UniProtKB/Swiss-Prot annotation:
Transmembrane segments: 1-21, 35-55, 59-79
The encoding gene: REEP3
Organism: Homo sapiens (Human)
Protein name: Receptor expression-enhancing protein 3
GO biological process assignments: cell division; endoplasmic reticulum tubular network organization; mitotic nuclear membrane reassembly; nuclear envelope organization
GO terms, molecular function: microtubule binding
InterPro entries, per the entry: TB2_DP1_HVA22 (IPR004345)
Keyword Hydrolase applies: no
Region (Disordered): 158-242
Polar residues composition bias: residue spans: 222-231
Amino acid sequence: MVSWMISRAVVLVFGMLYPAYYSYKAVKTKNVKEYVRWMMYWIVFALYTVIETVADQTVAWFPLYYELKIAFVIWLLSPYTKGASLIYRKFLHPLLSSKEREIDDYIVQAKERGYETMVNFGRQGLNLAATAAVTAAVKSQGAITERLRSFSMHDLTTIQGDEPVGQRPYQPLPEAKKKSKPAPSESAGYGIPLKDGDEKTDEEAEGPYSDNEMLTHKGLRRSQSMKSVKTTKGRKEVRYGSLKYKVKKRPQVYF
């Protein structure tokens, strides 16, 4: 466990941070020699990372495995041994030069197939989503239909306020309201029927105020000719626009 932690710390500090800083200085100063040196190192270190990932799962049980990793990283980085430059020039450069065209073809095919694969997966995902949405809608509609069918006609008619206005049943007025309306043929004061052409005066609508006035009024009712003459002469009509105002005047009493 201790060996694993030490080897991991050495790889991170001396294998990645230190070369990264000197690569920055090579780019800043535009030193071609240093630039080429660190480019070769990063190519070799990328290959080392791939091999390390596989080896950690297979041969990590080998004695002194983590100590060998520390020694190999220092050998690659050391300016005295120049292990990265040696591995690149002796092995990697000839191998990559011979397989370069095939590697390029594989990369192009991988891009095309990857694009087609992504498009196919996208279409399948959209189809699955659409199918799920349609299925959910059909199930919900069926549930609503079954719920409505479960109601009986009595349950539907007991719901208040659901009927349209035109379909609501007519409710007749109570008999008390019908009887409370006065008959058009009866007079409000004496119960004497009037003809259609006769007009009611204000005195007839209000009724007499005493017994003497009632007797006088009855006497005037018996003499229709005298009433017609007196009321015709005694009434004054005042018009205000379209309104007709009739002046109240009490009938004269003759002895």
